[in-house]
């Protein structure tokens, strides 16, 4: 499971998410087809595991 914000952002973009807005350290990504939204705190090397689980759920990913 990815815990680094850069790696999570790369995977979001690879899976069809685009950056919609940034407010402070919160980057909002929206999927172009499904309109799912995921918010990633960036830059942060080690995101808490509970937050990572929430990002995975918002993105529609299965846990690794």
Segments from the language model and where they lie:
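Basic nucleic-acid-binding interfaces
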Residues: 1-22, 26-64
């Amino acid at each position: 499971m990815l815990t680094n914000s850069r790696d999570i952002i790369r995977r979001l973009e690879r899976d069809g998410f685009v950056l919609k807005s940034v407010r402070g350290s919160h980057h909002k990504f929206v999927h172009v087809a499904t309109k799912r939204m995921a918010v990633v705190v960036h830059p942060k090397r080690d995101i808490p595991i509970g937050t990572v689980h929430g990002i995975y759920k918002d993105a529609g990913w299965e846990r690794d």
